[in-house]
Structure formats: C-alpha cells, structure tokens
C-alpha cells in the first residue's frame, strides 16, 4: 500500500485562541475560569480540525514577542491594535500544552511573524506537490491560494478560496498583494494610495494586471486621474506592497518528519 500524499494542517494558533477566548470572556466568568474554558474548547476544536482534515502532518504556529522587520521599516505597523488580554498572554504556555495534548507540535519564533512562518510552511510543501490547509480567519493568507494551498475560516465555516477572493475583491489571489498595495490594510495600519479605494483598485488591476504595469502606465502624459494619484504616491504603494507580501523563504530548522500526525510513539 502506497503512502498517502502529504497533507500539512497549519493552525494559526493565536488567531484561533483569541477568538475562542473572546467567547468565554463574554460570559460571567473570572479570568481564571475563562482560561480554563478556553483550554477545554481549544482541545475540542483541535480534535475536530484533525478529524475533519485527516492530515499527515500538523503544526500550530504562534507569534512570539516579535519586533518584526515590518516594524523596523514602518514603525506604525499594527499600531492601534487591541492588545491581548493580560490573563490570556500569561496563560499561553498552558494553551500551548493543550495543542501537545492533541498530538500537535507548536512553532514559536522570536524573530519572525507567524504569518511569514505559515506562508513558508505552506509554500514549501506545495512546491513538493503536497497539500497544505491553513486554519485562520486572516484574509492575508489568500495571497497564497493555489491548487495545493487552501484556507479554512473555522468560525464562519467557509473556505477562503479563489471564488471568495473574486467575490470579495474582484481580483485573482495572485493580484491581492497589489490590490492591498493600492488600498492599504486598515487592520495592520498599512496605508495605500490616498484616494484609491477598493472599487478603483479592482478596476485598475482588471485593466493593467499588476502594480508594475500600473506604475509604468502612470508615467504616461495622458494618464487617468487614478493613475495620477498613484504617480504622486508610488513610494507609499511600493512600501505597502512590501509590507503585505508574506515571506515564503524563512529557514525553519526542522523537517516534516518531526511534525508527522499522529506522532510516532516515543521509544
């Protein structure tokens, strides 16, 4: 019997945990009770994901106390975001143990953002012809969509696929980075081109294809009004493009054998 084609399940750990905890925090619970309930719910959710996905490999990726390269080049990156509740931050080790209880290893880096680690993992396995499923509500991962990479929004019970991207943004997944370069991403405090909103960005990309072609077109004497805005703010667009594009080539320091599921029994 041949071995099944590898299928890597990648869990955006804090994306999942924060939403599970928010539900418990709305109940009449003490912080300690909310953390206990979150842990129990996390184990239950993790087991559901494993049963539904039937992965051959699985990993939960955490954000560490990262001062990322994005913050270095753009100090306002993610400024204004609601901080994680103190009791949740203090309980993360216990929640990480909950993943291990389910047979799921955890990856945490002090130098790289979880989004870039997830992109590297998914892209790496896809390049070898295997499948990756990312569990997250973060639409930023939609730039990775291809036949080998899919994104599941667990809470809204939907796939963030090419059809979703087309409906939501009017462009293909491969054009999303350039779409956000024009519009910016409010949740990450990334500014795009002033005066270019989603509708105009969609129209421009449908006509020109990508940001490079738009930058060439905006230099023409008879450039349209929207292109003139881009000409005036092309540095902002290029910075936004750099910030929203996920890194896919981070050295990880481990191989697939170490995250096989179910894990090999200890000798």
UniProtKB/Swiss-Prot annotation:
Alphabetical GO biological process terms: DNA replication, Okazaki fragment processing
Binding site for K(+): 182, 193, 196
Interaction with DNA: annotated span: 195-200
EC code(s) of this entry: 3.1.-.-
Key words, A-Z: DNA-binding, Endonuclease, Hydrolase, Magnesium, Metal-binding, Nuclease, Potassium
Cofactor binding, per record: Binds 2 Mg(2+) per subunit. Only one magnesium ion has a direct interaction with the protein, the other interactions are indirect.
Domain 5'-3' exonuclease: residue ranges: 171-261
The keyword Ribonucleoprotein is assigned to this record: no
CDD domains associated with the record: H3TH_53EXO, PIN_53EXO
UniProt-recorded Gene Ontology molecular function terms: 5'-3' exonuclease activity; 5'-flap endonuclease activity; DNA binding; magnesium ion binding; potassium ion binding
Broad class of enzyme this protein falls into: hydrolase
Pfam families, alphabetized: 5_3_exonuc, 5_3_exonuc_N
Cofactor(s) needed for function: Mg(2+); K(+)
HAMAP family reported in the protein's UniProt record: Xni
Record-linked PANTHER family: 5'-3' EXONUCLEASE FAMILY PROTEIN (PTHR42646:SF2), FLAP ENDONUCLEASE XNI (PTHR42646)
This protein's name: Flap endonuclease Xni
Source organism of the structure: Aeromonas hydrophila subsp. hydrophila (strain ATCC 7966 / DSM 30187 / BCRC 13018 / CCUG 14551 / JCM 1027 / KCTC 2358 / NCIMB 9240 / NCTC 8049)
């Amino acid at each position: 019997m041949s071995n099944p084609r590898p299928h890597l399940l990648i869990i955006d750990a804090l994306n999942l945990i924060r939403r599970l905890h928010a539900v418990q925090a709305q109940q009449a619970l003490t912080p300690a009770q909310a953390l206990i309930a979150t842990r129990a719910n996390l184990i239950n959710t993790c087991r559901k994901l494993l049963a539904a996905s039937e992965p051959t490999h699985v990993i939960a990726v955490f954000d560490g106390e990262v001062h990322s390269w994005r913050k270095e080049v753009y100090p306002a990156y993610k400024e204004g975001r609601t901080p994680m509740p103190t009791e949740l931050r203090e309980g993360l080790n216990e929640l990480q143990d909950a993943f291990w209880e389910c047979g799921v290893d955890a990856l945490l880096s002090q130098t790289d953002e979880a989004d870039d680690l997830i992109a590297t993992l998914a892209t790496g396995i896809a390049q070898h012809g295997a499948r990756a499923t990312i569990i997250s509500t973060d639409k930023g991962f939609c730039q990775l969509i291809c036949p080998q990479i899919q994104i599941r929004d667990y809470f809204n019970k939907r796939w963030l696929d090419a059809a979703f991207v087309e409906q939501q943004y009017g462009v293909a997944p491969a054009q999303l980075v350039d779409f956000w370069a024009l519009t910016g991403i409010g949740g990450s405090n990334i500014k795009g081109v002033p005066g270019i909103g989603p509708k105009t960005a969609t129209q421009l990309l449908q006509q020109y294809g990508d940001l490079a072609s738009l930058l060439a077109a905006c230099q023409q004497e008879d450039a349209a009004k929207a292109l003139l805005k881009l000409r005036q703010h092309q540095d902002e667009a290029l910075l936004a493009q750099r910030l929203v594009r996920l890194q896919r080539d981070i050295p990880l320091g481990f191989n697939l054998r170490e995250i096989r599921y179910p894990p090999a029994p200890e000798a």
